[in-house]
Structures are given as structure tokens and as C-alpha cells.
A protein has these predicted regions:
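A general structural signal for well-ordered alpha-helical packing
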Residues: 136-143, 182, 186, 204
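Short, charged loop segments at secondary-structure junctions
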Residues: 164-199
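Short, conserved, surface-exposed binding loops centered on an aromatic residue
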Residues: 102-103, 145-147, 176-180, 207-211
Length: 281
């Protein structure tokens, strides 16, 4: 099949001439168009993706999630309530400790973050282009699996978009699970290329302030250095589910990686497409 990518079609080159080929004339006809070839999708056969409901929405470790941005009332303070939960205005009004009552939400978005920052691939062993393709295939396969399970899924790619003039914001698809969502994600992944981008740690810290609380964040990258590790730990400590997928033959975690396990962050290695089939988050 055609190789994944973003291709220009046209303009058509027209060549005319006499019967003997002594005189020829070249001219261009028509305009040009572009074609995006989607990436491969590998079926995740024995997925260990967490599922909250039969419909397939991913879950946090708790059966339900409380959204601290949605306060729906107050209740008397209970032993174990943190200071952030205390409703100080209501406490002052009643003379007794009162705690905030949060909206219960049963939905948790999945956010895929694919790192195609050229510098990170140059620093990792192995062929950069081959490793990048593996990362794109992993992202496409995970998105397909999650959306097939009716999980709201979003995508952010750190890299170059040949179809866009401004590369500053990366290639992004907002969270959704409509029928068109997979096509939108595959279209972005089809265009994505290695390129200049914001460093992964800075992106994680910036995105943390915008993600819905309790979201599942899947980071696909060829390497995790100490700065990225610190950002991942900060993300987990803030209440997000975090999974790291390292791609490429030389994918290694730093010596401090045992901290991931201590914080219950899953880490997987993908060296070949066959490894994608058994991915779990």
C-alpha cells in the first residue's frame, strides 16, 4: 500500500509534439490538490486498557470521579477531608466546619500525546524515521481501540504539519467519540512529521492546566529524560491517570524510572508492530 504521508497531486504536466518528436511543448494543466494517506492500524488483541462500563469508558482507580471544578453544594466536614475540600465561607457562616460537595462524573477522557520532536529522536538510538513511524502506528492503533470502546479520545502531536503554516500549537484533535473522530485523528497522524517542537516536559506541564481532572494521559515517545520524568510524576500527583509508551529499539527509561512504578504509572516498550498488539494502559 501507499506510504503514510501528505502528498501533492498535480498540476498535470502536458507534453505535446509533432509525429516525429522534433518539436515538443510542455505546459501545466489544472490546479493541484493534496492527498493524506492514513497510518496503519494494528489490532490490539489482548488489551489491558482499563474499562469502567460495558460501553468501554476508561476508569480511574475509584469507581466514580469527583470533579473539583464543579461544586454542587456543601456537607458537614468528615474526618479525612483535605484542607482544599473545606468550604471556608460556609464554615464562617455556620460556625461549623463545612466541606464542598463535588459533582460526580463517570466519564474520563483519554488524551494521546505523541512526541515527534526531532531532537528527541536524534538523541535516541536507531533509525529516527523508522522509530517515528512506529510511534505513529502505536498512536493510531490506540486511538482506534479506545474509540471502538466508545471512549472519548483526544490527540496532540509534537512535530511538523506540512499542511499548516504555523507549527507552534502542534497537531491537535479535541476530545470526542463521534463517528468522525477516528478519521480526524488518522488525518492528523497521516500528516504528522518529525520536526521542531516544544520540549515534551514543557508540553506536559502546559497541558496539565487544560486537561479535565482525572483524564487518562498516554504519552508516546522515544525517550524519557529526567525532566520528562519529573513532569510525568507531577501529572500523576495532580490526579491524572498516566501511561508511558516508549518506542524504538533503544527505548530506555532513566535510572529514576522506579518512581513511575511507585506512582502507579504504567510503562510499556514498543520495538516492533507486534508489540502494539499486547499494549495495555
Amino acid at each position: 500500500g501507499a506510504r503514510r504521508g501528505y502528498y501533492q497531486l498535480g498540476p498535470v504536466l502536458l507534453r505535446t509534439g509533432d509525429l516525429f518528436g522534433l518539436v515538443t511543448r510542455d505546459s501545466e494543466g489544472g490546479g493541484s490538490a493534496h492527498l493524506t494517506v492514513f497510518p496503519r492500524i494494528v489490532a490490539i488483541r489482548h488489551a489491558r486498557f482499563p474499562s469502567r462500563r460495558p460501553a468501554g469508558e476508561a476508569r480511574a482507580r475509584a469507581r466514580v470521579l469527583e470533579d473539583p471544578t464543579l461544586i454542587i453544594g456543601i456537607r458537614p466536614y468528615q474526618h479525612g477531608d483535605g484542607l482544599r475540600r473545606v468550604h471556608w465561607r460556609a464554615t464562617a457562616h455556620t460556625g461549623q466546619l463545612q466541606s464542598k460537595l463535588f459533582e460526580i462524573t463517570a466519564q474520563m477522557d483519554a488524551h494521546l500525546l505523541l512526541n515527534l520532536r526531532r531532537q528527541d529522536y536524534a538523541a535516541a538510538p536507531g533509525d529516527a524515521a523508522e522509530t517515528a513511524e512506529l510511534g505513529v502506528t502505536a498512536a493510531a492503533s490506540i486511538a482506534h481501540h479506545l474509540l471502538d470502546k466508545r471512549q472519548r479520545t483526544a490527540l496532540l502531536v509534537l512535530g511538523r504539519d506540512p499542511a499548516a503554516a504555523d507549527q507552534g500549537g502542534g497537531l491537535r484533535v479535541g476530545a470526542g467519540r463521534a463517528r468522525e473522530q477516528l478519521a480526524a485523528i488518522l488525518s492528523v497522524l497521516g500528516r504528522a512529521e518529525l520536526g521542531e517542537a516544544e520540549p515534551l516536559p514543557a508540553t506536559i506541564r502546559r497541558e496539565k492546566d487544560q486537561l479535565p481532572w482525572g483524564s487518562l494521559v498516554v504519552v508516546i515517545t522515544p525517550r524519557v529524560d529526567e525532566a520528562a520524568l519529573s513532569a510525568l510524576l507531577g501529572l500523576r500527583a495532580s490526579g491524572y491517570e498516566v501511561s508511558v509508551i516508549l518506542v524504538g529499539r533503544g527505548a530506555r527509561l532513566p535510572a529514576e524510572a522506579q518512581a513511575l512504578g511507585a506512582m502507579r504509572i504504567s510503562a510499556s516498550r514498543v520495538v516492533t508492530e507486534a508489540d502494539i498488539r499486547g499494549l495495555g494502559i
